[in-house]
Amino acid sequence: MFEYIRSHEGIRDILEIGTAVGYSAIQMASLRWDMTIDTVEINPDMYEQAVNNIMHAGLQDRVHAYLQDAYQFETKKIYDLIFIDAAKSQYRKYMEHFFKNARKGTVFFFDNLQFHGIVDCPELSQNRSTVQLTRKILKFREYLKTDSRFETAFHLDVGDGIAIAVVK
């Protein structure tokens, strides 16, 4: 994702769903001085660590962290890139919820679409809830292939599998 952002200079405003400890937001903001990132995290402990990490990196003027459920986060801002890295089973709902914050050319970036290889090989897991989750991820991948609002490229061999969906 970082290389994608680096090579697309038009990406300036980013929304990240799933801050965790702020690593991705910090890395994105460090790529170029002209980017701003809004990042949303529901877990208070993760959020607090992220805020500390963002401040330690000196990026608090360009990385804005919000502690709330992503479905409660409302903004009229239009983003160049929307990075969804939260609850994998909710990817489609997040995409629909934040589609109003997109325009033609906005990039939706989805991570972890292989889920450690289990999506394509469910026999790798004996855990029922993991198998159910990977079925939902597979269903989302299949849906994304047919969603005519996007031009989508899958790179399942990159990291843990990614999709880059550009709004038509």
Residue ranges and their predicted role:
Residues 1-168:
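S-adenosylmethionine/decaboxylated-SAM
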